[in-house]
Design a protein with these regions (language model features):
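C-terminal hydrophobic helical "lid"/dimerization subdomain
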Residues: 162, 166, 207-255
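A glycine-rich, Thr/Ser-enriched phosphate-binding loop motif common to dinucleotide/cofactor-binding enzymes
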Residues: 28-34, 50-73, 86-94
Length: 255
């Protein structure tokens, strides 16, 4: 049969999302795909990129598509733009790869000097260790020549948003794709107004956007960064490994 990947929102084809919850999301509102076999409607899947392994393709429906939508669909990234990624998780690494391939300059934050070295080896222009630099947003702003970044792929939420705003240029674009630091908190509204920023909330993407991303991947040399693969029976250990934040890129299950 065909080599396929699932959709995060099976009933979201294009245009406006028909739902504001995860009631039809596999692995959330309905049973997911941590199984050997599954029966689902054909239109709940798209073709996987030609030549990709199953592990590689499995990284696309959530992390890959979120990064694609953040930068390409919503951010309308162009060559020469400055992009800030936070950390080295799956979405951030995909954002790094997409941004570099499109001719942008990438900046990053990370929690360790070891990860900082790895990021620089991938082509990142500059890295700030946020455990050593509390005001990392101001530091990134200075590193861009006091201009600020055009795009921030914001994964932290209330605990990092103020720093992402500080790192941004006037008229910049922040895509909020995660809330790792909490679901609510203070928002520096005056700073948003002063910098005339656009802040867009994004939850993955639709079928049409996933197909666009896959077409792009088939004509580039981008492949996902897979940190570690766990057998299905060690699924709990996989989640614990993710929780500890030691990974770079994606963690996969071998079914």
């Amino acid at each position: 049969g065909d080599h396929v990947v699932s959709l995060f929102f099976p009933n979201w084809v294009k245009a406006e999302c028909p739902q504001a919850d995860f009631s039809y999301t596999p692995g959330d509102g309905i049973d997911g795909y941590a199984t050997s076999y599954v029966v689902r409607p054909e239109n709940w899947f798209t073709h996987a990129p030609k030549g990709w392994t199953h592990h590689e393709a499995a990284t696309l429906p959530t992390a890959g598509l979120t990064a694609w939508r953040a930068l390409v669909v919503e951010g309308k990234i162009k060559a020469g733009d400055d992009v800030l990624i936070l950390g080295t998780g799956g979405v951030s690494i995909f954002a790094l790869q997409f941004a570099l391939k499109m001719g942008a300059r990438v900046w990053a934050t990370t929690s360790s000097n070891e990860k900082a070295k790895w990021l620089l080896e991938q082509g990142v222009a500059g890295v700030v260790n946020y455990r050593e630099e509390e005001n990392w947003g101001e530091k990134i702003f200075e590193m861009t020549g006091n201009r600020g970044v055009d795009h921030v792929v914001e994964i932290g939420g209330p605990g990092t948003l103020a720093q992402s705003i500080a790192a941004s240029r006037i008229g910049g674009h922040i895509t909020l794709i995660g809330v790792f630091t909490g679901i609510s908190g203070d928002v520096p509204t005056a700073a948003i107004m002063a910098k005339q920023l656009t802040i867009k909330g994004v939850t993955v993407g639709n079928r049409s956007e996933q197909q666009d991303m896959i077409r792009a991947l088939e004509v580039t040399d981008i492949h996902p960064m897979i940190d570690k693969v766990f057998p299905l029976e060690e699924i709990q250990a996989a989640f614990e490994y993710q929780r500890d934040g030691k990974h770079i890129g994606k963690i996969c299950l071998d079914v």
